[in-house]
Regions:
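Conserved "ABC signature" C-loop
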Residues: 247-295, 322, 393-396, 402
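Helix-to-loop junction immediately C-terminal to a conserved catalytic motif
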Residues: 212
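Conserved ABC transporter NBD signature motif
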Residues: 220-228, 235-238
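Primarily ABC-family ATPase nucleotide-binding module
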Residues: 137-192, 228-233, 274, 343, ...
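ABC-family ATPase nucleotide-binding domain "signature/switch" substructure
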Residues: 241, 246, 257, 275-279, ...
Length: 403
């Protein structure tokens, strides 16, 4: 019974995780589910998981009561057997006396035994549910505690040099036969704008993850301001900023989203409004009844997709970084807004190093350095026109886009 209780606890945790994953999945792809008419599928799958979880919960709740009936039945059967044995072996007087003593002792001991049994079953079930959490705690046991975190916003970044040096970087994802990037060597001088271009699967996002320190190369090295990426961002917080293709918007105010990760007192009007201006959100926010303290709703439900993307750009500019990394950051914007933001980012050249990925070649045309990737390798490096002359595929893409 104890083994069964432990197994039920583990199964309960697994079903909870699986059902929550499905719920997050369907909300994250709700539009696709509606268009493809797959809502019924998700409803059915989530229903199966929740019904299975209900069965496990019901059995888990019932198990402690099984002990009660087992113990009570054992006491009654024991009394019958003892009474019968005494009647056979001795006289009725001894049988009645023995039976009375047994029943009196049983009535006092049985409740205590029952409580111990029920408690042990409950504990065993709870341990099964806690197993994933305990495993995670063991994994994190050697992680040092973070102390004395500096919550001030540094916009000066004294001593930081926005130079990136990549030396023979190679990275292969687990269970993949070929490297995602192979022998990448680059030197990105301070204040320049660099664009990584190439077809899907060429390794653009991988090289960005390596530059940011999200992934460590299997071979080679990456240095930002002379240090490995994670050490650089730890030494100069806010000197490096990143804008993803899909910006995460927290349920809160515009101010809180721009200063995400910082305490409220750090989100001054000057810093927030300055960041909003770069992202061309200042006029929109100024027209709102509560300005920067306007609620954006869960996942930014109260603002448009383009405004969410610009809010992500404003967040990146909050600390006035000296190195800005853009991963398709303007892809969801309309042409006019994209041109305005590209112009604002281009104006940072000289003071801020800008590294970007873009499929719209019009946004990278004015980059100082264009790096063309194919199958994880650098095929050409130079200005837009130089790469265009060196790579026929790139020239063909440019012509298709009217460039």
């Amino acid at each position: 019974m104890h083994v069964r209780a432990g197994a039920l606890g583990v199964k309960s945790s697994e079903l909870n995780i699986m059902s929550n994953e499905k719920i997050v999945e369907v909300f994250g792809s709700y539009r696709e589910s509606v268009v493809r008419n797959r809502r019924d599928y998700y409803a059915r799958e989530i229903g199966k998981l929740r019904f299975a979880l209900a069965d496990v919960s019901a059995e888990t709740s019932f198990m402690p009561y099984v002990s009660k009936y087992v113990i009570e039945t054992t006491v009654v059967l024991g009394a019958v057997l003892i009474g019968a044995a005494q009647f056979i072996l001795q006289d009725a007087t001894h049988a009645v006396a023995t039976l009375a003593i047994f029943l009196a002792a049983g009535s006092r001991i049985a409740p205590a035994v029952l409580r111990v049994q029920q408690g042990s079953i409950t504990i065993r079930g709870a341990l099964g549910q806690a197993t994933p959490t305990l495993d995670l705690i063991d994994m994190l046991g050697d992680t040092p505690m973070i102390e004395n975190v500096d919550d001030t916003v540094d916009v000066v970044h004294d001593g930081f040099v926005s130079e990136i040096q990549v030396e023979s970087a190679t990275l292969t994802y687990p269970n993949k036969p070929t490297p995602a990037i192979t022998d990448i060597s680059l030197c990105i001088p301070p204040g320049t704008s660099v664009a990584f271009v190439g077809s899907s699967g060429a390794g653009k996002t991988t090289i960005i993850d390596v530059l940011l320190g999200v992934l460590n190369p299997d071979e080679g090295s990456v240095l930002i301001s002379g240090l490995p990426p994670l050490l650089a961002v730890a030494k100069w917080p806010g000197a490096v900023s990143y804008v993803p293709q899909d910006v995460v918007i927290a349920a809160g105010t515009i101010r809180e989203n721009v200063a995400l990760g910082y305490p409220p007192e750090a989100a001054t009007d000057e810093l927030v409004n300055s960041a909003l201006k770069v992202a061309h959100l200042d006029r929109f926010v100024a027209g709102l009844p509560y300005g920067v303290d306007t609620q954006v709703g869960e996942r930014g439900a109260k603002i448009s997709g383009g405004q969410r993307q610009r809010l992500g750009i404003a967040r990146a500019m909050f600390t006035r970084p000296h190195l800005l990394v853009l991963d398709e950051a303007t892809s969801s914007l309309d042409g006019e807004t994209e041109a305005s933001i590209s112009e604002a980012i281009h104006a940072l050249r000289g003071s801020t190093t800008v590294v970007m990925i873009a499929h719209r070649l019009s946004t990278v045309r004015n980059a100082d350095i264009v790096v063309y990737l194919s199958e994880g390798k650098v095929m050409a490096t130079g200005t837009f026109e130089e790469v265009r002359s060196a790579v026929p595929d790139f020239d063909r893409q440019a012509k298709l886009m009217g460039l």
